[in-house]
């Protein structure tokens, strides 16, 4: 094969298929907190289907389970710990400023 045709051939590298995040035996339920907590961000938001790598049906069931857990106060609606940490560390220094005339 000459060099010009060789450039377009791709090497057939094997890739390892990722395991699905929800196994067939896992029950998607609002009481299954270990499963639900995997699909929530650190801020308490529901992660998107693309990030979770779920099917449409699984994502719908996860979303419903998370919302039920929030209503029954098993999960917080928001996790605002980062906001409090940020507000404590910032200090205002208005007294040190001098006005230029």
Swiss-Prot record:
<dbReference type="InterPro" id="IPR036870">
    <property type="entry name" value="Ribosomal_bS18_sf"/>
</dbReference>
<comment type="subunit">
    <text>Part of the 30S ribosomal subunit.</text>
</comment>
<keyword id="KW-0694">RNA-binding</keyword>
<dbReference type="GO" id="GO:0006412">
    <property type="term" value="P:translation"/>
</dbReference>
<keyword id="KW-0150">Chloroplast</keyword>
<keyword id="KW-0689">Ribosomal protein</keyword>
<dbReference type="InterPro" id="IPR001648">
    <property type="entry name" value="Ribosomal_bS18"/>
</dbReference>
<dbReference type="GO" id="GO:0005840">
    <property type="term" value="C:ribosome"/>
</dbReference>
<dbReference type="GO" id="GO:0019843">
    <property type="term" value="F:rRNA binding"/>
</dbReference>
<keyword id="KW-0934">Plastid</keyword>
<protein>
    <recommendedName>
        <fullName>Small ribosomal subunit protein bS18c</fullName>
    </recommendedName>
</protein>
<comment type="similarity">
    <text>Belongs to the bacterial ribosomal protein bS18 family.</text>
</comment>
<dbReference type="InterPro" id="IPR018275">
    <property type="entry name" value="Ribosomal_bS18_CS"/>
</dbReference>
<dbReference type="GO" id="GO:0009507">
    <property type="term" value="C:chloroplast"/>
</dbReference>
<dbReference type="Pfam" id="PF01084">
    <property type="entry name" value="Ribosomal_S18"/>
</dbReference>
<keyword id="KW-0699">rRNA-binding</keyword>
<dbReference type="GO" id="GO:1990904">
    <property type="term" value="C:ribonucleoprotein complex"/>
</dbReference>
<dbReference type="GO" id="GO:0003735">
    <property type="term" value="F:structural constituent of ribosome"/>
</dbReference>
<keyword id="KW-0687">Ribonucleoprotein</keyword>
């Amino acid at each position: 094969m000459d060099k010009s045709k060789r450039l377009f051939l791709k090497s057939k590298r094997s890739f390892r298929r990722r395991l699905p995040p929800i196994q067939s035996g896992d029950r998607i339920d609002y009481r299954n907190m270990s499963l639900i907590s995997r699909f929530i961000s650190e801020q308490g938001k529901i992660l998107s289907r693309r990030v979770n790598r779920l099917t449409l049906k699984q994502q719908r069931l996860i979303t419903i389970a998370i919302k039920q857990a929030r209503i029954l106060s098993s999960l917080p609606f928001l996790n605002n710990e980062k906001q409090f940490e940020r507000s404590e560390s910032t200090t205002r220094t208005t007294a040190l400023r001098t006005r230029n005339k």
